[in-house]
A protein has these predicted regions:
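Generic short beta-strand
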Residues: 103, 158-159, 192
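PAS and PAS-like sensory modules
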Residues: 143-148
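Extreme N-terminal signal-anchor transmembrane helix of membrane signaling/transducer proteins, especially
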Residues: 1-32
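Extracytoplasmic/periplasmic sensory segments of membrane signal-transduction proteins
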Residues: 36-45, 52-142, 185, 196, ...
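Short, glycine-/polar-rich solvent-exposed loops and beta-turns at beta-strand/coil boundaries
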Residues: 106, 149-150
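Residues in well-ordered beta-strands of folded domains
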Residues: 6, 174, 193-195
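Conserved beta-strands of PAS-like sensory domains
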Residues: 152-186
Length: 200
């Protein structure tokens, strides 16, 4: 009996050690899997965002040099721009994956000139909350950003509209995050949401 008791005690200690080792090993594996999944999702979303940034800034720059857009600001005639943008938005919807792209033209004093998706709403002052437009006016250079606006948080590419160096206004390509959410679910079976700091 004196011999058996220490053996039983050692066996119990050994079993506890094995269980603890197994438990911590499983915990580490789970943590590693979670970390790897998290990193994969981060890289995936970042790549998706960069693709959208490229689309936004490239098209904003192209539209900023569009004849109809420039003429509409020079003549203060919104109908000219509406005509020019009609074919562009049609092409987006029919020939690209970016079905919900929106185009917004601003005046040089940072007021809404034409929202192609809502032409009846214009003239509102954007200077108090649209910091990207102010930056483009100051630098006369295009940029991309995620920013809050009247339509909520969206990804934007903003470019200056210039005529022989004179700043006439700016144009932005606006995209939602819908395609990223859809693609992440389809490709990774992951649910993605986009949040912003309340202060913004």
């Amino acid at each position: 009996k004196k011999i058996y008791l220490p053996l039983i005690f050692l066996a119990v200690i050994g079993l506890i050690s094995v269980l603890l080792t197994t438990y911590f090993s499983i915990q580490k594996v789970e943590k590693d899997v979670y970390t790897n999944e998290k990193e994969s999702l981060r890289v995936y979303v970042q790549n998706q965002l960069e693709a959208k940034y490229d689309v936004a800034i490239t098209n904003a720059i192209t539209i900023a040099s569009n004849y109809y857009v420039i003429e509409s600001l020079l003549k203060e005639d919104r109908a000219i721009a509406a005509k020019g943008l009609k074919e562009i938005t049609k092409t987006f919807k029919e020939q690209t994956d970016f079905k919900n792209v929106q185009i917004h033209i601003h005046t040089k004093d940072i007021k809404s000139f034409l929202r192609e998706w809502m032409p009846q709403k214009f003239g509102d002052d954007l200077s108090s909350f649209r910091h990207t437009i102010k930056k483009v006016k100051e630098s006369k250079l295009p940029l991309t950003a995620i920013e809050m606006g009247v339509a909520g948080m969206t990804l934007r590419g903003v470019a200056p509209i210039l005529k022989e160096g004179e700043y006439l206004g700016s144009v932005e390509i606006i995209q939602s995050f819908g395609s990223i959410v859809t693609n992440a679910k389809k490709d990774l079976d992951a649910s993605v949401i986009f949040l912003t700091d309340k202060k913004q």
